[in-house]
Protein backbone atom coordinates (compact mmCIF):
# COMPACT_ATOMS: atom_id res chain seq x y z
CA UNK A 1 0.00 0.00 0.00
CA UNK A 2 2.71 2.47 1.01
CA UNK A 3 4.81 1.62 -2.03
CA UNK A 4 1.87 2.80 -4.14
CA UNK A 5 1.24 5.94 -2.07
CA UNK A 6 4.90 7.02 -1.83
CA UNK A 7 5.32 8.16 -5.48
CA UNK A 8 2.02 10.09 -5.23
CA UNK A 9 3.22 11.83 -2.09
CA UNK A 10 6.64 12.61 -3.53
CA UNK A 11 5.10 14.14 -6.67
CA UNK A 12 2.73 16.26 -4.59
CA UNK A 13 5.53 17.44 -2.31
CA UNK A 14 7.75 18.26 -5.29
CA UNK A 15 5.00 20.41 -6.79
CA UNK A 16 4.29 22.09 -3.45
CA UNK A 17 7.96 22.66 -2.71
CA UNK A 18 8.56 24.13 -6.17
CA UNK A 19 5.69 26.51 -5.59
CA UNK A 20 7.14 27.54 -2.24
CA UNK A 21 10.62 27.97 -3.73
CA UNK A 22 9.32 30.16 -6.54
CA UNK A 23 7.49 32.28 -4.00
CA UNK A 24 10.65 32.58 -1.90
CA UNK A 25 12.81 33.69 -4.84
CA UNK A 26 11.47 37.23 -4.67
CA UNK A 27 11.11 39.54 -1.71
CA UNK A 28 8.54 42.33 -1.36
CA UNK A 29 10.47 44.49 -3.84
CA UNK A 30 10.72 41.73 -6.44
CA UNK A 31 14.48 41.28 -6.03
CA UNK A 32 15.91 37.79 -6.33
CA UNK A 33 16.93 36.08 -3.12
CA UNK A 34 20.59 35.08 -2.69
CA UNK A 35 19.80 32.29 -0.20
CA UNK A 36 21.51 29.01 -1.01
CA UNK A 37 19.42 25.86 -1.43
CA UNK A 38 19.25 23.44 1.50
CA UNK A 39 21.57 20.47 1.02
CA UNK A 40 22.56 17.54 3.20
CA UNK A 41 25.65 18.31 5.27
CA UNK A 42 28.45 15.74 5.35
CA UNK A 43 29.11 13.87 8.56
CA UNK A 44 32.52 13.56 10.27
CA UNK A 45 33.58 10.87 7.83
CA UNK A 46 32.85 13.08 4.85
CA UNK A 47 29.83 11.06 3.74
CA UNK A 48 26.51 12.81 3.13
CA UNK A 49 23.82 12.35 5.76
CA UNK A 50 20.72 10.41 4.84
CA UNK A 51 22.11 7.04 3.80
CA UNK A 52 20.04 5.01 6.26
CA UNK A 53 17.40 2.42 5.40
CA UNK A 54 14.34 1.06 7.18
CA UNK A 55 15.08 -2.64 7.64
CA UNK A 56 12.46 -5.33 8.32
CA UNK A 57 12.97 -7.84 11.10
CA UNK A 58 10.57 -10.50 12.37
CA UNK A 59 10.86 -11.97 15.85
CA UNK A 60 9.38 -15.24 17.07
CA UNK A 61 5.72 -15.58 17.99
CA UNK A 62 4.42 -18.08 20.53
CA UNK A 63 0.93 -16.99 21.60
CA UNK A 64 -2.14 -17.71 19.47
CA UNK A 65 -2.77 -14.00 18.88
CA UNK A 66 0.84 -13.27 17.99
CA UNK A 67 1.10 -16.20 15.59
CA UNK A 68 -2.08 -15.02 13.86
CA UNK A 69 -0.88 -11.42 13.59
CA UNK A 70 2.56 -12.44 12.35
CA UNK A 71 0.87 -14.44 9.60
CA UNK A 72 -1.12 -11.37 8.56
CA UNK A 73 2.03 -9.25 8.37
CA UNK A 74 4.00 -11.87 6.44
CA UNK A 75 1.25 -13.10 4.10
CA UNK A 76 0.55 -9.55 2.93
CA UNK A 77 4.16 -8.32 3.24
CA UNK A 78 2.90 -5.36 5.24
CA UNK A 79 6.16 -4.55 7.01
CA UNK A 80 8.11 -4.87 3.76
CA UNK A 81 5.65 -2.48 2.13
CA UNK A 82 5.99 0.00 4.99
CA UNK A 83 9.79 -0.15 4.83
CA UNK A 84 9.91 0.18 1.03
CA UNK A 85 7.66 3.24 1.17
CA UNK A 86 9.74 4.97 3.83
CA UNK A 87 12.95 4.15 1.95
CA UNK A 88 11.49 5.56 -1.27
CA UNK A 89 10.49 8.81 0.41
CA UNK A 90 13.04 9.75 3.04
CA UNK A 91 16.78 10.21 3.44
CA UNK A 92 17.04 8.54 6.84
CA UNK A 93 19.98 9.64 9.01
CA UNK A 94 20.63 6.04 10.11
CA UNK A 95 19.31 2.52 9.62
CA UNK A 96 15.97 2.12 11.38
CA UNK A 97 14.55 -1.35 12.08
CA UNK A 98 10.85 -2.03 11.70
CA UNK A 99 10.32 -5.00 13.98
CA UNK A 100 7.43 -7.41 13.98
CA UNK A 101 7.27 -8.84 17.46
CA UNK A 102 5.14 -10.42 20.15
CA UNK A 103 4.36 -7.68 22.67
CA UNK A 104 1.70 -9.45 24.76
CA UNK A 105 -0.40 -6.34 24.24
CA UNK A 106 -2.27 -4.67 21.38
CA UNK A 107 0.07 -1.92 20.25
CA UNK A 108 2.31 -0.40 17.60
CA UNK A 109 4.83 2.27 18.51
CA UNK A 110 8.02 4.14 17.77
CA UNK A 111 10.58 3.10 20.40
CA UNK A 112 12.63 6.22 21.04
CA UNK A 113 15.26 4.50 23.19
CA UNK A 114 15.87 1.63 20.77
CA UNK A 115 15.25 3.87 17.75
CA UNK A 116 13.10 1.31 16.03
CA UNK A 117 9.50 0.91 14.88
CA UNK A 118 7.77 -1.91 16.76
CA UNK A 119 4.70 -3.44 15.12
CA UNK A 120 3.14 -5.84 17.60
CA UNK A 121 1.76 -9.05 16.13
CA UNK A 122 -1.28 -8.75 18.37
CA UNK A 123 -2.34 -5.49 16.70
CA UNK A 124 -3.78 -6.67 13.34
CA UNK A 125 -5.17 -9.81 14.95
CA UNK A 126 -7.11 -7.76 17.50
CA UNK A 127 -8.29 -5.27 14.89
CA UNK A 128 -9.67 -8.08 12.76
CA UNK A 129 -11.77 -9.16 15.75
CA UNK A 130 -12.87 -5.58 16.39
CA UNK A 131 -14.07 -5.04 12.83
CA UNK A 132 -15.72 -8.48 12.74
CA UNK A 133 -18.02 -7.20 15.49
CA UNK A 134 -19.17 -4.40 13.16
CA UNK A 135 -20.54 -7.05 10.78
CA UNK A 136 -17.98 -6.13 8.13
CA UNK A 137 -18.05 -8.95 5.53
CA UNK A 138 -14.24 -8.88 5.23
CA UNK A 139 -12.87 -7.69 8.61
CA UNK A 140 -9.27 -8.32 7.55
CA UNK A 141 -9.39 -5.46 5.02
CA UNK A 142 -10.29 -2.71 7.52
CA UNK A 143 -7.93 -4.30 10.06
CA UNK A 144 -5.05 -3.95 7.60
CA UNK A 145 -6.12 -0.43 6.57
CA UNK A 146 -6.27 0.70 10.20
CA UNK A 147 -2.89 -0.89 10.88
CA UNK A 148 -1.41 1.11 7.99
CA UNK A 149 -3.04 4.25 9.37
CA UNK A 150 -1.55 3.70 12.81
CA UNK A 151 1.84 3.01 11.20
CA UNK A 152 1.68 6.43 9.53
CA UNK A 153 0.91 7.96 12.94
CA UNK A 154 3.94 6.22 14.45
CA UNK A 155 5.99 7.25 11.42
CA UNK A 156 5.20 10.81 12.47
CA UNK A 157 6.90 10.20 15.82
CA UNK A 158 9.81 8.58 14.00
CA UNK A 159 10.32 11.55 11.66
CA UNK A 160 10.08 14.06 14.51
CA UNK A 161 12.73 12.10 16.41
CA UNK A 162 15.00 11.24 13.47
CA UNK A 163 15.16 14.78 12.09
CA UNK A 164 14.74 16.62 15.41
CA UNK A 165 11.76 18.46 13.96
CA UNK A 166 10.16 21.29 15.93
CA UNK A 167 6.74 20.45 17.35
CA UNK A 168 4.35 22.99 18.78
CA UNK A 169 1.52 21.31 20.63
CA UNK A 170 0.87 17.77 21.75
CA UNK A 171 3.04 15.38 19.74
CA UNK A 172 0.32 12.71 19.58
CA UNK A 173 -1.98 15.15 17.78
CA UNK A 174 0.88 16.17 15.49
CA UNK A 175 1.52 12.51 14.62
CA UNK A 176 -2.13 12.19 13.59
CA UNK A 177 -1.52 15.19 11.33
CA UNK A 178 1.41 13.39 9.69
CA UNK A 179 -0.80 10.38 8.93
CA UNK A 180 -3.39 12.65 7.32
CA UNK A 181 -0.73 14.62 5.46
CA UNK A 182 0.76 11.48 3.90
CA UNK A 183 -2.57 9.91 2.97
CA UNK A 184 -4.25 13.02 1.59
CA UNK A 185 -1.75 14.06 -1.08
CA UNK A 186 -3.19 14.46 -4.60
CA UNK A 187 -1.74 12.69 -7.61
CA UNK A 188 -0.68 14.24 -10.90
CA UNK A 189 -4.38 14.48 -11.82
CA UNK A 190 -4.88 16.61 -8.67
CA UNK A 191 -7.23 13.95 -7.28
CA UNK A 192 -6.82 12.20 -3.95
CA UNK A 193 -6.10 8.49 -4.02
CA UNK A 194 -9.31 6.71 -3.03
CA UNK A 195 -7.60 3.83 -1.23
CA UNK A 196 -5.46 6.23 0.78
CA UNK A 197 -8.51 8.21 1.85
CA UNK A 198 -10.16 4.95 2.88
CA UNK A 199 -7.17 4.10 5.07
CA UNK A 200 -7.58 7.41 6.91
CA UNK A 201 -11.33 6.93 7.28
CA UNK A 202 -10.81 3.39 8.57
CA UNK A 203 -8.34 4.76 11.09
CA UNK A 204 -11.14 7.10 12.21
CA UNK A 205 -13.48 4.10 12.38
CA UNK A 206 -11.00 2.37 14.69
CA UNK A 207 -10.85 5.38 17.01
CA UNK A 208 -14.66 5.43 17.01
CA UNK A 209 -14.73 1.76 18.04
CA UNK A 210 -12.30 2.49 20.87
CA UNK A 211 -14.31 5.55 21.91
CA UNK A 212 -17.48 3.47 22.11
CA UNK A 213 -15.69 0.80 24.14
CA UNK A 214 -14.13 3.29 26.56
CA UNK A 215 -17.34 5.21 27.17
CA UNK A 216 -17.47 8.76 28.50
CA UNK A 217 -13.95 10.21 28.93
CA UNK A 218 -12.86 10.56 32.54
CA UNK A 219 -10.15 12.70 34.11
CA UNK A 220 -7.39 10.25 33.19
CA UNK A 221 -8.36 10.37 29.51
CA UNK A 222 -8.33 14.17 29.45
CA UNK A 223 -4.91 14.14 31.14
CA UNK A 224 -3.47 11.54 28.75
CA UNK A 225 -0.88 12.50 26.12
CA UNK A 226 -3.38 11.32 23.49
CA UNK A 227 -6.51 13.30 22.78
CA UNK A 228 -9.70 11.38 23.61
CA UNK A 229 -10.53 8.96 20.80
CA UNK A 230 -13.69 10.85 19.85
CA UNK A 231 -11.66 14.03 19.33
CA UNK A 232 -9.25 12.13 17.10
CA UNK A 233 -12.19 10.83 15.06
CA UNK A 234 -13.41 14.35 14.36
CA UNK A 235 -9.90 15.59 13.57
CA UNK A 236 -9.30 12.89 10.94
CA UNK A 237 -12.73 13.40 9.39
CA UNK A 238 -12.15 17.15 9.30
CA UNK A 239 -8.82 16.82 7.53
CA UNK A 240 -10.19 14.31 5.02
CA UNK A 241 -13.07 16.66 4.25
CA UNK A 242 -10.77 19.70 4.17
CA UNK A 243 -8.42 18.04 1.67
CA UNK A 244 -11.29 17.53 -0.80
CA UNK A 245 -14.62 19.05 0.30
CA UNK A 246 -16.37 18.02 -2.90
CA UNK A 247 -15.00 14.50 -3.19
CA UNK A 248 -15.48 13.77 0.52
CA UNK A 249 -18.76 15.62 0.97
CA UNK A 250 -20.41 12.44 2.26
CA UNK A 251 -18.55 12.96 5.54
CA UNK A 252 -20.70 16.01 6.22
CA UNK A 253 -23.81 14.89 4.33
CA UNK A 254 -23.99 11.73 6.44
CA UNK A 255 -23.71 13.73 9.64
CA UNK A 256 -20.33 12.27 10.60
CA UNK A 257 -18.78 15.73 11.02
CA UNK A 258 -20.68 18.72 12.46
CA UNK A 259 -21.18 21.57 10.01
CA UNK A 260 -19.75 24.03 12.53
CA UNK A 261 -16.38 22.24 12.34
CA UNK A 262 -16.58 21.40 8.65
CA UNK A 263 -16.62 25.03 7.48
CA UNK A 264 -13.11 25.50 8.88
CA UNK A 265 -11.60 22.21 7.72
CA UNK A 266 -10.30 23.32 4.34
CA UNK A 267 -8.18 26.07 5.91
CA UNK A 268 -7.19 23.74 8.76
CA UNK A 269 -5.85 21.09 6.41
CA UNK A 270 -4.15 23.70 4.24
CA UNK A 271 -2.20 24.94 7.27
CA UNK A 272 -1.21 21.36 8.17
CA UNK A 273 -0.20 20.61 4.60
CA UNK A 274 1.98 23.69 4.19
CA UNK A 275 3.65 23.14 7.56
CA UNK A 276 4.63 19.55 6.79
CA UNK A 277 5.81 20.36 3.27
CA UNK A 278 8.14 22.91 4.86
CA UNK A 279 9.37 20.51 7.54
CA UNK A 280 9.83 17.39 5.43
CA UNK A 281 10.91 18.70 2.02
CA UNK A 282 14.61 18.97 3.03
CA UNK A 283 14.59 15.30 4.00
CA UNK A 284 12.83 13.87 0.94
CA UNK A 285 14.71 11.85 -1.65
CA UNK A 286 15.08 13.17 -5.17
CA UNK A 287 13.94 10.68 -7.84
Regions found by a protein language model. Give the residues of each.
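A metal-dependent hydrolase signature that marks the N-terminal structural subdomain at the beginning
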Residues: 19-118, 123-133, 274-287
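Active-site/pore-lining binding-face segments in mid-to-C-terminal subdomains
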Residues: 184-237
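Short alpha-helix carrying the canonical HExxH Zn2+-binding catalytic motif
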Residues: 140-160
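An active-site-proximal "capping" alpha-helix that borders the catalytic cofactor pocket
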Residues: 168-187
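Pan-zinc metallopeptidase signature
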Residues: 42-59, 63-64, 218-287
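C-terminal motif of bacterial Sec signal peptides marking the signal peptidase cleavage site
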Residues: 14-17
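Bacterial N-terminal signal peptides that target proteins for export
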Residues: 1-8
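Acidic helix-start/capping segments at beta-turn-to-alpha-helix junctions
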Residues: 94-110, 174-178, 192-212
Amino acid sequence: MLTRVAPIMLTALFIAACGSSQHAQTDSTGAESSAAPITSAPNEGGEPEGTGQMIVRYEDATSKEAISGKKIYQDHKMLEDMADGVNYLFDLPQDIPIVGKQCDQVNAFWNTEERQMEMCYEFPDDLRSEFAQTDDPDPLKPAMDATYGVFFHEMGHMLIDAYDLPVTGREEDVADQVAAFVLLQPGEDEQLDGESVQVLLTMADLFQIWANENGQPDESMFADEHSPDQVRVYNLLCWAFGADPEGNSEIVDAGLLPEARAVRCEDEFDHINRAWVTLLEPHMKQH
